[in-house]
């Protein structure tokens, strides 16, 4: 499996802001937006392109555009924070959705939403989720995509844990990984260590809010 760890000073600085427990929701979202755009940029490096003539104010120049823009598929909830940076880089991309919640006792994914094209064959797919922990949610999502014919799947995660990376490697599923960091372990609650906490809560606040 192809794994790209994006080693860049700006990537590292935004990831540091996201890790910092002092970063409030607004600061975390801003750093996530910047980092998301950088990871999408890197993930797009090998996308197929086509060339055409374009007229400048002076002469004709060779233009370039994506041959087939990828479909962006966030894993809800935390993956929603990566849609805007993805679309800022690839504005003509389509967006699909996979909704998965985590069972806090078993740490297994619980599906609740699936909004995807029926046929994903010959279609690049960018599967976005800020965190790859156990790999359960990501593997479930990849299987859903593969069932629809997807063979060109790139998982884009801000922070990955080594156990989740190993699970992805051993799955045999058609996927490559682009990430800003691979952290060494998970704690007993299946949180990435050192990680950055609960990405969904840090983006949007706690799931259950008493009014």
From Swiss-Prot:
CDD domains, A to Z: PRTases_typeI
Domain of life assignment: Bacteria
Needed co-factor(s): Mg(2+)
Pathway as given in its UniProt record: Pyrimidine metabolism; UMP biosynthesis via salvage pathway; UMP from uracil: step 1/1
Binding site for 5-phospho-alpha-D-ribose 1-diphosphate: 77, 102, 129-137, 198
GO MF term list: GTP binding; magnesium ion binding; uracil phosphoribosyltransferase activity
Alphabetical list of InterPro entries matching this protein: PRibTrfase_dom, PRTase-like, Upp_B, UPRTase/APRTase, Ura_phspho_trans
This protein's UniProt keywords: Allosteric enzyme, Glycosyltransferase, GTP-binding, Magnesium, Nucleotide-binding, Transferase
Reactions accelerated catalytically: UMP + diphosphate = 5-phospho-alpha-D-ribose 1-diphosphate + uracil
Single GO biological process annotation from the record: uracil salvage
Pfam families, A to Z: UPRTase
EC number, UniProt record: 2.4.2.9
Signal peptide start and end residues: none
Role of this protein: Catalyzes the conversion of uracil and 5-phospho-alpha-D-ribose 1-diphosphate (PRPP) to UMP and diphosphate.
Family, similarity comment: Belongs to the UPRTase family.
NCBIfam families associated with the record: PRK00129.1, upp
PANTHER family linked to this entry: ADENINE PHOSPHORIBOSYLTRANSFERASE, URACIL PHOSPHORIBOSYLTRANSFERASE, CHLOROPLASTIC
Stated name of the protein: Uracil phosphoribosyltransferase
Taxonomic source organism: Corynebacterium efficiens (strain DSM 44549 / YS-314 / AJ 12310 / JCM 11189 / NBRC 100395)
